[in-house]
Amino acid sequence: MKKDDYGIIGGSELLISYGRHTPWNNINILRSYEDAMSQTKTGNHWSSTENSSNNAWNVNFNSGNTNNNNKNNNNVVRPAVAHDSEWTALRETIQTAYIDCCKGKSSSRQCLDYIPHADEDLDVLTDELMNGTYTPDTSTCFLVKYPKLREVFAAAFRDRVIHHWIILRLEPLFEQICHKQGNVTHNCRKGFGTKTAVLSVQKGIKKVTNNYRCNATIFKGDLVGFFMSIPQRRMCDKLKEFINAQYHGDYKEMLLWLVEIVVMHRPEKNCMFNSNPEDWVGLQANKSLFRCEEGRGMPIGNLTTQQFANFYMAEFDGYVLQCLQAHKHQMRRQKKRFRWSYSRFVDDFIIVCNDKEFLMNLVNKCDEKLLEMGLSLHKHKRYIQPANHGVMFVGTYIHNGRNYLSNRTIGRFEERVHGFIKYLNEHEKEITITELEHIRDTINSYLGFCKGRQTYRFRKRIVGQFILQCQKYFFRSAHYNKIKLRRKFRPIFK
């Protein structure tokens, strides 16, 4: 089904978006009854001809009266379109993906802008999927400066719905891989995160060192420009091979087609900039899609990028685990005990074992495997030390059964708190409840990260400073774990 000369899918039988503006598709919007009449030869978009007494009714919602052929009424009733069961079933899955996409984003500007037109655009999106005409829309590119300079691409909201549609079908299969590998990866998974990653490394060190009584060696590796180095074609082929072998649900061909489109899409060739172009000067070449090698790179910011990258690294996880298990069996035949532990978070991974010579050889094998995958280890970010020296991982320094915040995290926390104090003092008469809630949520987020780490004295100092300066608005919990907004001030700011 193709668009006709007037931008209407399927010709005059389907009048889409009549009386509304839908900025997320390429349809030429018909803004009035007269426009609709002038752009067709028959003028028969309704149940009958224009002057027929059986014509479609326009409802005056202000008075409740119904006025036949009221051309000046803005509350236009769109004609109902009959769809087959296949279209309806697909539309329901798109609706499910849309609801999943809106979770946690209902207050964002993109979501609020999309909601009034969601039903119409999701209908159009369903048509595009049925007809095989879907293409990604324009993305928004911007730079995040905090905590470090990073390039981010925000996909159009309708494209995010497609991303969720894909992941809803593939995520359970990705989880099966993670479970089979022993849950060694902790990013982009429900129930996992930085906390479980730190606990995994801590338990691994404790196991390998026999409760800190034996010697062991730690290797920490980091990949160079991970997201911008991923070869698109290799990843796409791996995903399609995996789907063909493991996916047995509905819309398999459509899923394969969408994976090809999403993975091979180059958003930097069709994007809007929301940051000063001069800021890109300070961004490393291997951190930007605009300067990475052709056929490489995935946009940071998309749900599919995170999930697909995690799936891609599962191949590396499997290789490392296979090498460790093989050496364990070899040592067992020699009646020697070999202990090991492996954990990964995105592109950072840690291997702990009690055989230093084997670990050095394994690092070289990891280099070769990553080169085969189109990736590479960072030469200047290789950490090999005795386990009793501790290791820094995902913002936490893990040392002999204790966890400490990294200096960088402490510095960022102090910087934010002092910035909030200054802002509250300078805008005392202008501050709103929304801004106060944002300040509360940000500080509590940092305090939440402090849990499980030896941070009591630090929390007492930094929270004490904040409450001392801002006690008019906030108060703290007993153990400096949380700050709360004083309720008696809320009506004033509303």
State each model region's role.
Residues Y114-T138:
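Amphipathic alpha-helical blocks
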Residues A155-A156, H164, K287-L289, E293-E294, ...:
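Right-hand nucleic-acid polymerase module
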Residues G104-S108, L112, D137-V161, C178-F192, ...:
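Short, conserved non-catalytic motifs in the polymerase core
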Residues E171-P231:
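Active-site-proximal segment of RNA-dependent polymerases
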Residues S85-D123, R486-K494:
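Non-catalytic, polymerase-adjacent accessory regions of viral genome-replication enzymes
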